[in-house]
Amino acid sequence: MRNLFNKNKEHRGIMPIGDGEVLSLGAQTNGTYYQSYNASYSTNWFGGKRPIQFSVGAYFSKQTDVSSNYYNSSYYNNYYNYLYGYGNYGYNNYENYYDPDKYVKLFGMSLGWGKRLRWPDDYFQLSVQLAYTRYMLKNWRYFLMTNGNSNNLNLSISISRTSTDNQLFPRRGSEFVASVTLTPPWSSWDHKDYKNLATNSQSSLYEREQQEKYRWVEYHKWKFKGKTYTALTSGQKCLVLMTRVEFGLLGSYNKYKKSPFETYYVGGDGMSGYSTSYAEETIGLRGYENGSLTPYGYEGYAYDRMSLELRYPFLLGNTTIYGLTFLEGGNAWNDTNKFNPFNMKRSAGIGVRIFLPMVGLMGLDWAYGFDKVFGTRGGSNFHFILGQEF
């Protein structure tokens, strides 16, 4: 990066070459209701002598909500149209009910370090990340906490092993990641009575007590993800069986101070797109709608997911296209003590993946969910996939 603006025989303009450093600047919006900005820098040769990874990043996002008038207007207009057979004619346009006094803002920074290990073998890697996030809420009804500011200081440690033979279409090998994220146990030394804090939502002190209770978020978060790839036929274009298993648990140091953030948002395509919040980890489960397994009031503090997937490549190389068919199951629980990896919501389906060098990985899946989720069956669902999945 130090030669970003220097010119020589091999380097013209502001396009750096050489050490694989990455500088990323990004912005995303859907118009009025969501904006996101991020910047990051990473290198695989920190210090210039050994293959040590280093990264630093920061981000800011804001999501707003609609005013209560939207729901009232929608109800009365739909009732009027039902009686007289009229259409809405745009009277309930979502954009017309933007409420700047209902929002959740997130600001975060992170510092990361990683190193390849030589034991047990050369495929292992150790990664450590120190991160800070500040949540700023105003009249936000999708969390246990609706108003105020909250802080999250955490340390993540992960060990991964990757031995696949191809990044775009693996035929053999495996991928495993085990991680733990820890915050300081603030409740162990602040001498506060969390059992009797913010328990009565009708109290005039409820919001103030919420702010006091969640000023510093505390939790311990455990995750495991694993994939294996097995070639069932010979040759470059071969039939491949992919198996997947993953699970996560979000625990608390104090049972009266469960974290309202960093829960699991389970169901659907698994992309971290528009949802009721951006302080959740998005987990896909095809055959069910986005977040349908963890609706408001039933936040996910534990989840599991298992998959069997058959893949066959139609085109290999810089542009890769392959089809797939799959069986999948998973579930989510709002209490870690109720975690049962064999109580799954099942689905099956087919799909296709396309990798284009200038675009990245894209996909489309059709899946059918066989089981009921909160009284409704999953049924037929289409899922759009953008980006590489673990």
Residue ranges and their predicted role:
Residues 6, 133-135, 183-185, 328-332, ...:
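Short connector loops/turns at beta-strand edges and beta->alpha or beta->beta junctions
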Residues 33, 105, 151, 218, ...:
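Short, glycine/acidic-rich beta->alpha junctions
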Residues 1-170, 174-176, 286, 297, ...:
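Gram-negative/organellar outer-membrane beta-barrel architecture
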Residues 271-277, 337-390:
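C-terminal beta-signal and terminal closure region of outer-membrane beta-barrel proteins
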Residues 38, 42, 160, 223-227, ...:
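Short, well-ordered alpha-helical packing segments
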Residues 1, 138-316, 320, 325-326, ...:
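C-terminal outer-membrane beta-barrel translocator/porin domains of Gram-negative envelope proteins
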